Amino acid sequence: TKAGYTIVVATNQSGLGRGYFDIMTLNARHQKMQNAHKAAGGQIEAIFFCPHTASDNCDCRKPRQGMFSTISERFDTPLEDVPSVGDSLRDLQAAFLAGCTPILVLSGKGKKTLENGGLPPKTIIFDDLSAVADHLLEADQKNSASRDKNTETP
């Protein structure tokens, strides 16, 4: 993105494994999401999905961290403290297990997730994705100003 973030999506799509929709339908949904991000000035670098059902007992289905491990390997980036946004408990659990900072958005299923409790430690909560983006950009500006202040010479 313009702000220097790499946006990656990790999504459970058991409907594919159950035969509710095919890969072409899923790709069309993903393209729609990418187009919406692009229209807002963002860019999704990659979309990772798990097509398995819970009974398949795979490593990639959230709340397991398999997709996150794949993302870390593919982008050659450790995920410690990387912000990870989701609206379900399993999103947050997978993020926490991978060492990310779990961020709950109250849009989508987020309000119900908050009501049900059991959030991972240090979960940060925002109203929506826009509020998350604003927070991250503000934090970056503060960190940049702090670095600039620390490198000034008298």
Task: Indicate where each model-derived feature is located.
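Conserved Lys-Pro-Asp/Glu-containing loop-to-beta segment of HAD-superfamily phosphomonoesterases
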Residues: 59-92
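Intrinsic-disorder-associated, low-complexity terminal segments enriched in Asp/Asn/His/Tyr and depleted
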Residues: 148-150
